[in-house]
Swiss-Prot record:
Protein name from the UniProt record: 4-hydroxy-3-methylbut-2-enyl diphosphate reductase
Pathway note: Isoprenoid biosynthesis; dimethylallyl diphosphate biosynthesis; dimethylallyl diphosphate from (2E)-4-hydroxy-3-methylbutenyl diphosphate: step 1/1; Isoprenoid biosynthesis; isopentenyl diphosphate biosynthesis via DXP pathway; isopentenyl diphosphate from 1-deoxy-D-xylulose 5-phosphate: step 6/6
The protein's enzyme class: oxidoreductase
A Gene Ontology BP annotation from the UniProt entry: terpenoid biosynthetic process
Co-factor(s): [4Fe-4S] cluster
Any one GO molecular function term: 4 iron, 4 sulfur cluster binding
Gene coding for it: ispH
């Protein structure tokens, strides 16, 4: 059985940067926490906990020490609270997410109604929305644009892990409503390239494994695009979840991983597939 690992599987720039900053902060002799999980990888969060860095839901219990801002960013009022408490802030927000936050702030301040393309329940989107005024709307598709109030000036940004196709659909609907429209493509290049590579790989193989946290939006999206082309697609978080029965009658297996999946998890998955391969 041949196994092909996607070239761009694993950490993206923003996640790599955030984890590096978190582990560096963990090595200092200070009371250190992350505001929310640093990335959507339970394994990385656990490793940080073992080093004494716990994830907090809010800042209520903190009156001193270091707070690390998660890669997805946080709400503007939480940054303000950390500053008001004079906490030492390590801002590990992904630069692409930061750019989306800045665009929303600028658009709102100049009188635009803002449309954020993304998942309203995702912490990245909730953080982005907080930088705008009272005319910020989250839509998951072009259809949802039709439910929005009429606005003369519309600004559009996207959650960094959205598909370009979905952004185009939303913009198309906005254009049909008339008025002035400004669009900022805040989709991370790594996300788009990773999805295209995963699609190409899914077309070539008999079975596809997508590795990453079940709470990771970009990993779930990878699994979705792969499943559209290869029905035998399995989203797993660790090597322990692999079922040897998946590979019955399979000549070629493809493996990709989300942007928040650490290399050691990918290595364990590849090792487990190798073990199954030897037995067969």
């Amino acid at each position: 059985m041949r196994v092909i690992l996607a070239k761009r599987a694993g950490f993206c720039f923003g996640v790599k940067r955030a984890t590096q900053m978190a582990f560096e902060a963990a090595g200092m002799d200070k009371k250190t926490y992350t505001l929310g999980p640093i990335i959507h990888s339970p394994q990385v969060v656990k490793k940080l906990e073992e080093m004494g860095v716990r994830a907090l839901k809010d800042l209520d219990s903190m009156d001193s020490g270091t707070i690390i801002i998660r890669s997805h960013g946080v709400a503007s009022h939480e940054i303000a609270e950390a500053m008001q408490k004079k906490l030492e802030i390590v801002d590990a927000t992904c630069p692409f997410v930061k750019k989306a936050q800045e665009h929303v702030k600028s658009l709102s301040e100049t009188g635009y109604g803002v449309v954020v393309v993304g998942d309203a329940d995702h912490p990245e989107v909730q953080g982005i929305v907080s930088y705008g005024g009272d005319k910020v709307f989250v839509v998951g598709s072009g259809e949802e644009v039709r439910k929005l109030p009429i606005m003369n000036k519309i600004g559009v940004v996207a959650q960094t892990t959205q598909s370009f196709e979905n952004l185009k659909n939303v913009v198309s609907e906005c254009l049909q409503r008339g008025g002035e429209i400004r669009v900022f493509n805040t989709i991370c290049d790594a996300t788009a390239v990773r999805q295209e590579e995963a699609k190409e790989l899914a077309r070539q193989v008999d079975c596809m494994l997508v590795v990453g946290g079940f709470n990771s939006a970009n990993t779930r999206r990878l699994a979705e695009v792969c499943a559209e082309l290869q029905p035998r697609t399995h989203h797993i978080e660790t090597a322990a979840e692999i079922d040897p029965a998946w590979f019955e009658g399979v000549a070629t297996v493809g493996v990709t991983a989300g942007a928040s999946t650490p290399k050691w998890i990918i290595d364990e998955v590849m090792g487990r597939i190798g073990e199954i391969n030897k037995k067969n």
